[in-house]
Amino acid sequence: EKLVDEAVNFNAFDLLQQMAWRIAAEGQRVLREDFVIEIARDPRYKGADRVEKLVDSLIGLHIVEQSVDHKGSWLTFFVDTYLEYFFARRLALDFCERHAPLPGQLDVTNERNFEILKLTLELICSGWVRKEGCIADGRDFVKTLYDLGRNPAQPATTTTADGVLQT
């Protein structure tokens, strides 16, 4: 089955979501699909090298193999998408681009949640957030990590008169 994103834009997340739901429905952890793009459809992404960079940047996809037809107008990627990775990246993207709050109950000791936090930080550092909000988002994220990582039973950190931190 070929999944075609003719516009070659970031609406491809809908395509990825379909793939992720198929994985969940079939009880698999990994799904391999053909991902087909018409190279010449959008002048912004003319050329296989640009399309390759675009597909490689899509959250949740890992390129296994690629090929271009003999006319150079269609580019086919064989991609793997991983269920846990996809959903972790999706949550991280929601936090960075849509300013969605991190779940208050997020437990940083849970390995899956820790992956979401790492990926969120990765997205902030790589410029996925809006430029005007990048620094503020980064500060908010670090503060959120700090708040989540603190044990509520411990007293807050204070500074003595001579500048020494104590708990």
Locate each region found by the language model.
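C-terminal leucine-rich, beta-strand-based interaction scaffolds used for sensing/assembly
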Residues: 28-114, 130, 134-165
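Short amphipathic alpha-helical interface segments
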Residues: 13-29
